[in-house]
């Protein structure tokens, strides 16, 4: 079964004014769609790999034939990263997490504000294209960043919150003002989804 572009759980203009409609449309229908198309093309001659999940492919890249390893890394990573990204955004987002996730953030980082500052620094400090992440690693929360479309899954970590800092994610609205885009991101974070992913990651 080929991989498919997931539908967005909200309209393209739902995240306005924080993330604009045109960016969301191009980002989803063009950029993400291209990763899916190229991933399927890379796997086309390898029926033994076509039934594997994205997580199975990305968590063991070394097991893949060398001829398709880079294509799966880049396009499979792009598909995984964006599939998560769309779900952790919401027009009803923002605010702060509650419950178990809030407790874990306070315990690890001292406060929600301190966590936001550290995550924002990871996003702003990622040179060139890449992502900032909140991951679960051995049951613990951790902030990390990855280059290009690399996924924390490749390092055995479980991403629960991600921010795309490729220029295609923000340039139409924010041009080179990445810190403004990062600040706007906090207004649309779907903390219920992040909390769900945290619970699932801890149960692994």
UniProtKB/Swiss-Prot annotation:
Keywords: Manganese, Metal-binding, Oxidoreductase, Phosphoprotein. Its EC number is 1.15.1.1. The keyword Phosphoprotein applies. Transmembrane segments: none annotated. One of its GO terms (cellular component) is cytoplasm. Pfam families: Sod_Fe_C (PF02777), Sod_Fe_N (PF00081). PROSITE patterns: SOD_MN (PS00088). Its cofactor is Mn(2+). PANTHER family: 37S RIBOSOMAL PROTEIN S26, MITOCHONDRIAL, SMALL RIBOSOMAL SUBUNIT PROTEIN MS42. Belongs to the iron/manganese superoxide dismutase family. This is Superoxide dismutase [Mn].
